[in-house]
A protein has these predicted regions:
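Short beta-strand elements that form the blades of beta-propeller/WD-repeat-like
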Residues: 20-23, 29-33, 59-64, 98-103, ...
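Sec-dependent N-terminal signal peptides
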Residues: 3-14
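A short beta-strand motif characteristic of beta-propeller blades
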Residues: 20, 39-48, 77-83, 119-126, ...
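Short loop/turn segments that connect beta-strands within beta-propeller blades
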Residues: 36, 73-76, 115-119, 155-159, ...
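Eukaryotic tandem repeat interaction scaffolds
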Residues: 150-152, 159-221
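Blade-level signature of beta-propeller repeat domains, shared across WD40, Kelch, NHL, RCC1
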Residues: 245-272
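Loop/turn residues immediately N-terminal
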Residues: 28, 36-37, 65-69, 106-109, ...
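Repeated scaffold domains used in trafficking and secretory/extracellular systems
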Residues: 18-27, 47-57, 86-94, 129-137, ...
Length: 272
């Protein structure tokens, strides 16, 4: 299966090893940020609504409607398929030759890790999970949360290391270099996963998070981005959209926000 591509978007999180992207159905492209600039990778075939995308800096990885993962460089190649019938891939992240995938089912989730070097797929199912709300590979481990208020930490073999109840509807998460994890909630609270300390920082819901060095950037349901220090003291805020921010990505000193309509707007980090 080969399709010519023309480069004419790359979303990157706060850490160089964690690259991201998303699918824009309206113009049939992969959207990403590179060197602080918004870019497009135009695909010469149909993109279906709500497809997921991952990126490791060399290739993009797209999930199709059959839960197959396709590697996209200058052509498209089949890599692997999740074995569960009836699940919906909701997360893809690619780091260090490994592709991490979450596939949602009714009150259950299937997690897969594909090692490109070994051409090997490892999958395990976890029950009593109602849809993945955040998904963070951490070194060789994997952290994820579900909308029904649970957080899971898995080892490199996908064995459960830790499971916590963290409160209703964690919507977003980010991590610092030392792997401290913060969770953002619908009610405007922030939770430090390691200490268990919660703090109310917004009156509106926290829909997106990005951690960078000693700073935290929060996107809310009204389209505003807030800048906090690591002690959760407010350092500034900027209106970016008129509706909910679903993702925040940072690259080269530029913050890029994505709203529910897949619009992208940028802010200089030092403008707060």
């Amino acid at each position: 299966m080969r399709f010519l591509l023309c480069i004419s978007l790359f979303l990157i999180t706060a850490f160089a090893q964690q690259l991201g992207c998303f699918i824009n159905e309206s113009n049939q492209s992969i959207v990403f940020i590179k060197d602080g600039q918004i870019k497009n990778l135009d695909l010469k075939d149909t993109i279906y609504k709500n497809q997921e995308c991952g990126n490791d800096g060399e290739s993009f990885y797209i999930a199709n409607l059959n839960n197959e993962i396709i590697e996209v460089t200058n052509e498209k190649n089949f890599l692997f398929a999740m074995p569960n019938v009836g699940c919906k891939i909701s997360q893809i992240m690619a780091i260090k030759n490994k592709i991490y995938v979450a596939c949602d089912m009714a009150n259950e989730v299937s997690i897969g890790v594909f090692d490109k070097n070994l051409n090997k797929l490892l999958t395990k199912n976890y029950k009593d999970v109602y849809k993945i709300s955040s998904f963070l590979p951490i070194d060789d481990e994997l952290f994820f949360t579900s909308f029904n208020g649970k957080a899971f930490l898995l080892d490199k073999e996908l064995n459960l290391k830790e499971k916590k109840r963290v409160g209703f509807a964690p919507l977003s998460a980010c991590k610092f270099k030392e792997n401290d994890i913060l969770l953002g909630f619908r009610d405007g609270e922030i939770l430090d996963f390691k200490s268990g300390i919660k703090k109310q920082v917004l009156k509106s819901k926290i829909s997106a998070l990005a951690c960078m060095e000693d700073e935290i950037f929060i996107g809310d349901g009204d389209g505003v981005v807030y800048k906090f220090d690591k002690d959760l003291k407010l350092k500034g805020q900027k209106a970016l959209f008129n509706n909910e921010i679903k993702r925040i990505f940072i690259d080269k000193g530029v913050l890029n926000g994505v709203n529910l309509d897949n619009e992208i707007k940028s802010l200089e980090i030092n403008s707060f």
